[in-house]
Design a protein with these regions (language model features):
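Hinge/beta->alpha junction and helix N-cap segments in small-molecule ligand-binding domains
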Residues: 1-12, 27-33, 56-59, 76-84
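Short, well-structured alpha-helical segments in soluble
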Residues: 8-22
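Alpha-helical structural signal in soluble globular domains
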Residues: 19, 36-44, 64
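Periplasmic-binding protein-like
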Residues: 20-30, 49-55, 74
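A generic structural signal for alpha->beta connector loops
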Residues: 49, 69-70, 107
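Short beta-strand elements at the ligand-binding edges of bilobed clamshell
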Residues: 67-79
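Hinge/cleft segment of the Venus flytrap/periplasmic-binding protein
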Residues: 80-129
């Protein structure tokens, strides 16, 4: 089941960490779970004990990178995903399937606190096409 509610992710993460104090790494695979997990880590004061990797980004997760509740973000490129997906669909519908690559890499950028303000990270976090 994929969680899409940050509050539920916060509650579940807090319960998981309380029940298993030996956990020192968390990976949250979408934006809402990244937000909720970061909130739980911060509320429990575990910024120094738990290494949290989140996917995608928003104001809350970027702030978490700055304050320490998030240690890394895997930032995808939704513009490229949408654009290249539509382009591929167009080629299929217009008989140009032979021009399609079997795999399309839309790129990701791993953003840490240490490279948060680099040009590449800023482009990934605030991409507009």
């Amino acid at each position: 089941t994929t969680l899409v509610d940050a509050e539920q992710a916060r509650e579940d993460t807090a319960a998981l960490l309380a029940g298993h104090p030996d956990i020192n790494v968390l990976v949250a695979f979408n934006e809402p779970t990244s937000v909720g997990a970061a909130q739980a880590v911060e509320e429990l004061g575990l910024e120094e004990q738990v290494f949290l990797v989140g996917f995608d980004s928003n104001v809350a997760t970027i702030e978490g990178l700055q304050t320490g509740s998030v240690d890394a973000l895997v930032v995808q490129n939704p513009y490229a995903m949408g654009y290249l997906g539509v382009e591929s669909a167009y080629r299929l519908l217009t008989g140009q399937a032979e021009e399609l690559a079997p795999m399309v890499d839309t790129s990701t950028q791993i953003v840490y606190r240490s490279n948060l303000f680099s040009l590449d990270s800023q482009k990934a976090l605030f991409a507009f096409g």
